[in-house]
Regions:
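Class I SAM-dependent methyltransferase SAM/SAH-binding core
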Residues: 26, 34-88
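Conserved catalytic loop of SAM-dependent methyltransferase domains
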Residues: 170-204
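A short glycine-rich, Lys/Arg-flanked "PGG" loop and its adjoining helix->strand segment in the class I
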Residues: 112-127
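A short acidic, Gly/Pro-enriched loop at the edge of an enzyme's catalytic core
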Residues: 87-99
């Protein structure tokens, strides 16, 4: 798994990778406001998107999963790069406004723990952006063979994971509507993106989903659990 970092570096320096980064950056920017004083973190591999998400940020954390290996990024001195355990993020409670997850979610073995950690780290109105390979997309095989992704996702699976872990999906987008192994197609990528986004989401290579932290849902669930435990205890005492 540690060779993933090198695979990503090689990919994003290639002509295909540069086309992909331009397309994905545009998709991110359509849903990523550049408000000042935001506390932002990116987990995974996102060197091609640092300038986009780091703009005007109050603080920025670049979190690289330990299994990806080590890689040095030149960031502003008030920012932090760290190799992390995705299930135990070195981030204080309620200390992030945005979390971008790219080249990370598809390598996790336990998405529930990761999403609960993300929920903990995000502020009450925090948002999470997740970019993952699509199970039915043209890039599914490329992600598995070249990036060694452990799995791909359908939009139903993503929605279920987010909702069950106290996030509310607020926008869904699709991208990469051209096959990755054909030079002719990726040279016409802008055309395929325009047509594909209108008519062929089923064949999109990646899903981009944005969700908001559902703070009240988690509090309500906790109260219900406590209430049920109290009720059971009362019944036992009565017996």
């Amino acid at each position: 798994m540690k060779k993933n970092i090198e695979n990503f570096k090689i990919f994003y320096s290639s002509p295909l990778g540069k086309v992909v980064s331009k397309i994905i950056a545009k998709k991110i920017s359509q849903n990523w406001t550049t408000d000042s004083n935001l506390r932002i973190a990116l987990i995974g591999f996102g060197s091609a998107y640092l300038d986009l998400v780091n703009r005007k940020a109050q603080s920025f954390f670049l979190l690289i999963p330990m299994l990806h290996g080590l890689y040095h990024f030149s960031l502003k001195k008030n920012n932090l790069t760290a190799s992390v355990n995705e299930y135990n993020l070195p981030i204080d409670d309620l200390s992030l406004d945005r979390l971008l997850v790219i080249h990370s979610f598809e390598y996790l073995n336990d998405h529930k723990i990761f999403l609960r950690e993300s929920w903990r780290a995000l502020d009450k109105n925090g948002e999470i952006f997740i970019i993952v390979p699509h199970s039915f997309g043209l890039w599914r095989r490329y992600y598995k063979n070249n990036f060694f992704a452990l799995r791909t996702f359908t939009i139903f699976e993503l929605n279920s994971l987010l909702v069950n872990n106290f996030f509310t999906p607020i926008s869904i987008d699709y991208s990469l509507f051209f096959p990755p192994n054909n030079n002719y197609f990726f040279k016409k990528a802008s055309f395929f993106e325009k047509v594909g986004s209108r008519f062929f989401n089923f064949f999109a290579g990646v899903i981009i989903i944005k969700a908001k932290k559902n703070y009240s849902a988690a509090i309500l669930k906790e109260r219900n659990i406590i209430k049920r435990k109290t009720t059971r205890a009362s019944r036992v005492d009565a017996i």
